[in-house]
Amino acid sequence: MNILAVDTAGKTAGVALLQDDRLLYEVYLDGGMTHSETLMPMIDTCLKLCGLTCADIDLYAVNAGPGSFTGLRIGLAAVKGLAFPRETLCAPVSTLEALAAAHTGEGTVLCALDARRAQVYSAASVSYTHLRAHETLRH
């Protein structure tokens, strides 16, 4: 299974490609919030370097927030546009759950992100094992 993951929720844009649970490609670009200009070339480069096309992608995973409203819209719109022609499945990924997934120990996990204007996005006791089938969405 080929999974193309896109993250545009923050200042850096990220693209990754997983093939059968193996990371083939990963890149982050700190372009100063210019995701609208950099995301599609990042995806194009990823696919070319991995020898794949959009037709080879089985699932698109996209950061669905919390994060920059404009950044999230750019990522979601790009993935929706790529998925639509072939009705490829798309899966929303929570920023906070993705952070919690890096925790390998036991116990409570507290994730927090700067929401600007002296506010914080946070979640406690987040458990994230694997993307479940019912969490996937059609374009």
Across the structure, where does each feature detected by a protein language model lie?
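Acidic-residue sensor for enzyme active/binding pockets
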Residues: 7, 26, 135
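Single conserved hydrophobic/aromatic residue that forms the stacking wall/gate
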Residues: 130-139
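Nucleotide and nucleotide-moiety/phosphate-recognizing core
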Residues: 2-4, 18-128
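N-terminal amphipathic/basic leader segments beginning at the initiator methionine
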Residues: 3-14
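Glycine-centered loop/turn positions within well-structured domains
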Residues: 13, 118, 138
